[in-house]
Structure formats: C-alpha cells, structure tokens
C-alpha cells in the first residue's frame, strides 16, 4: 500500500540517527550542518526511549526545509545515513507565527476512550504535541524542556540555487559526486558578496595532512569529522589545544587530501566563517 506523500512543511523529521550521541552534542551537530540552508527556529531532540535516534529541525521558511531535505537525504551523519521527510503538521512555534495555534485540551485527550485512540493519537497525548507529527512516528517529541535561550538564527545565504548541496556534500539523487544541478553556479559563485574562497594559504607542496584556519569558536572534532569523513582515505581530525580557529585533518595520501581540500575550500560552518584549507607544511 502506497504511503501518501506529505506536503512541504517548515519542519523536517530526521530518523536513523546514531543513538549513542549525547543530546547536546547531537543538537550542536545538527545545527552545524543544517544552518547553511536558512534560519533555524528550533531543533528538538528527546532523551526518551521511543524517540531515540530521531530529531525535528524547524526552519522559518519552507524553502529552507525543502533544500535541506533534498540535499542532505542519506548524508552519512555519525556513520549512519540520515532519513529525512517533512513533518505532517506544523510545529507549535510555526503555528503561532501563522496565527493558527490552538491550545490543546490535554485532559480531554487523556479521557478519550482507548478504543477510539489510534497509535498516533496515543503518542500525541503522551508528548503534548510539542513537535509536529511525522510519518510512522506520530506526535510530538515527548519530555522536551523549553529552550533556555533564544534559538540561534542563521540567515539564508543569498544566491544559493534550489536544492544545491554544499560543496563536498552528497549530491541529490541522480547526480554524480562533484556534478552540479542544471543551471547551478560553481561553488565559488554561490554567495554574492562572499570573500573569494581562498587562494592556497601558502605554496606548500601536496601533503596528506591538511591545515584548516578561520574556524568558528563552536567548532569541535566531531563537526569536522562529519565534513571530512565522507572523503576516501580520511583518518582523523586533530585540534590544537588553546586554539579554536585552526585544526589539522589527516588522510592516507596526498591525492585524497587534495580532493577533500578542493571540495570543502570555503565551506561555511557558520555564516561568517568560510573555512580556509591548505596543505600542511612537511
């Protein structure tokens, strides 16, 4: 029986996530890879047993959610390919923005006869509808506490063509690695006003170790590993104690390191930090 297609939504639902990753680390990493597609209003991740390996990312614009879904479908995230779909209903934060939010009568829902409850309704009652309903995982993220601070806002990068994956990311279905969608501009031309992606920082000869600079303060080893481990020959990321803005990435050989450097040169981990990559000095 065919599953009805869910219409585009501000919120995307992600499952098949690595359940061993801590909640705070997972939210930071999801923000790091999805913020490039537009303003993120919230990311919902739950510790509950039923919702492990799942998350909701809420964008301000539907187009941002669409770009994220198409570009990142199947992306290897902590060694597992992400499965992404639209949420079936608006999240509360979006409903409030639209003026369609309706406070739920949870007591009435709980008194509903069990014989009339569907599995989806049961989950919605348990979770309080804090997050949108999606696919076979119906209802909200149960037990999610309110955010303790305002969500970080990442503005959409002007000029990014629809469904264009960031440099080096897995392309949409039907495109070979490195191939651009029809009509798309090369990565160096994606963002008008952006500083040119960096000529090589030095004339260092090819090396199997890359030197990264201009990294944002929130960069950590896991974030960089997720970017580079999609390339053949990746071995490890090494951070420099006391310096958040630089790092080293090691590959098996110079050719593999060069391919990763060319693909991720100028990649923006945040809107204001275009990563600069060169071969490390031997």
Curated annotation (Swiss-Prot):
One of its GO terms (biological process) is mRNA splicing, via spliceosome. Residues 101-141 are annotated as: Disordered. The modification Omega-N-methylarginine is found at residue 152. GO terms for molecular function: identical protein binding; RNA binding; U1 snRNA binding. It comes from the Eukaryota. SUPFAM superfamilies: RNA-binding domain, RBD (SSF54928). SMART domains: RRM (SM00360). Keywords: Acetylation, Methylation, mRNA processing, mRNA splicing, Nucleus, Repeat, Ribonucleoprotein, RNA-binding, Spliceosome. The modification N-acetylalanine is found at residue 2. It is found in: Nucleus. Residues 10-89, 208-282 form the RRM domain. PROSITE patterns: RRM (PS50102). The modification N6-acetyllysine is found at residue 60. Residues 119-141 have a biased composition (Low complexity). Belongs to the RRM U1 A/B'' family. U1 snRNP is composed of the 7 core Sm proteins SNRPB, SNRPD1, SNRPD2, SNRPD3, SNRPE, SNRPF and SNRPG that assemble in a heptameric protein ring on the Sm site of the small nuclear RNA to form the core snRNP, and at least three U1 snRNP-specific proteins SNRNP70/U1-70K, SNRPA/U1-A and SNRPC/U1-C. Interacts with SFPQ; component of a snRNP-free complex with SFPQ. This is U1 small nuclear ribonucleoprotein A. The lineage of its organism: Eukaryota, Metazoa, Chordata, Craniata, Vertebrata. The gene is SNRPA.
